[in-house]
Amino acid sequence: MAKKTYDLLFKLLLIGDSGVGKTCVLFRFSDDAFNTTFISTIGIDFKIKTVELHGKKIKLQIWDTAGQERFHTITTSYYRGAMGIMLVYDITNAKSFENISKWLRNIDEHANEDVERMLLGNKCDMEDKRVVLKSKGEQIAREHAIRFFETSAKANINIEKAFLTLAEDILQKTPVKEPDRENVDISTTGGGTGLKKCCS
């Protein structure tokens, strides 16, 4: 049997209206790539990326969901096992922001109670086309006690920071396992809270 190359597996989910840039956000993080010609996600897709946090190798299994209503039944079935959910809206599309309340209700109905949530206002590089003020995103994040970032997959703004912060929040509430391994060094190497990227 092959030896595991990671210590922990975190399942993350990207949700939000169609066209807000979920797939672009995912590809920027997983492959450091940006493509303007992505077609709409059909149903659900996922990427894997391994990162290192506090000396632990964490495999992130990131699911990219379709935003269209006709895929609603398929995608909500993936909420249950998610440990972290990113809600994405487009700062140039007011409707996508208004629908965040609907997506939050979906999480309440279908996800685990202790799931970590994060709000992303994407396409922040398009300041000249902005219709959703940053303060609006901050307000809804405060109301629901969740983290908030404005991101740009195109300009690579806050993408890695958002994913690593979400992984960090999940790690903080993950119980330390493996009590049978006496040689485990639980001290954090290097101290501090340095978030280190590791190649997938």
Swiss-Prot record:
Molecular function per GO: GDP binding; GTP binding; GTPase activity
Region (Disordered): 181-200
UniProt keyword Calcium, yes or no: no
Catalytic activity: GTP + H2O = GDP + phosphate + H(+)
Entry's Gene Ontology cellular component terms: cilium; endoplasmic reticulum membrane; endoplasmic reticulum tubular network; endosome; endosome membrane; Golgi apparatus; insulin-responsive compartment; phagocytic vesicle membrane
E.C. numbers: 3.6.5.2
Membrane found in the keyword field: yes
Motif Switch 2: chain residues: 64-81
Sequence motif Switch 1, residues: 32-46
Sites where the protein binds GTP: 18-24, 35-36, 40-41, 67, 122-123, 125-126, 152-154
Chain residues that bind Mg(2+): 23, 41, 64
Enzyme class: hydrolase
Topology of this chain in the membrane: Lipid-anchor
Keywords from the UniProt entry: Cell projection, Cytoplasmic vesicle, Endoplasmic reticulum, Endosome, Golgi apparatus, GTP-binding, Hydrolase, Lipoprotein, Magnesium, Membrane, Metal-binding, Nucleotide-binding, Prenylation, Protein transport, Transport
Compartment list: Cytoplasmic vesicle membrane; Golgi apparatus, trans-Golgi network membrane; Endosome membrane; Recycling endosome membrane
Cofactor: Mg(2+)
GO BP term (any one): establishment of protein localization to endoplasmic reticulum membrane
Lipid-modified residues, S-geranylgeranyl cysteine kind: 198-199
Pfam families with a match to the protein in the record: Ras (PF00071)
Regulation: Regulated by guanine nucleotide exchange factors (GEFs) which promote the exchange of bound GDP for free GTP. Regulated by GTPase activating proteins (GAPs) which increase the GTP hydrolysis activity. Inhibited by GDP dissociation inhibitors (GDIs) which prevent Rab-GDP dissociation.
Similarity annotation: Belongs to the small GTPase superfamily. Rab family.
Entry function: The small GTPases Rab are key regulators of intracellular membrane trafficking, from the formation of transport vesicles to their fusion with membranes. Rabs cycle between an inactive GDP-bound form and an active GTP-bound form that is able to recruit to membranes different set of downstream effectors directly responsible for vesicle formation, movement, tethering and fusion. That Rab is mainly involved in the biosynthetic transport of proteins from the Golgi to the plasma membrane.
PANTHER family xrefs: LD44762P
Domain topic, free-text comment: Switch 1, switch 2 and the interswitch regions are characteristic of Rab GTPases and mediate the interactions with Rab downstream effectors. The switch regions undergo conformational changes upon nucleotide binding which drives interaction with specific sets of effector proteins, with most effectors only binding to GTP-bound Rab.
Protein name (Swiss-Prot/TrEMBL): Ras-related protein Rab-10
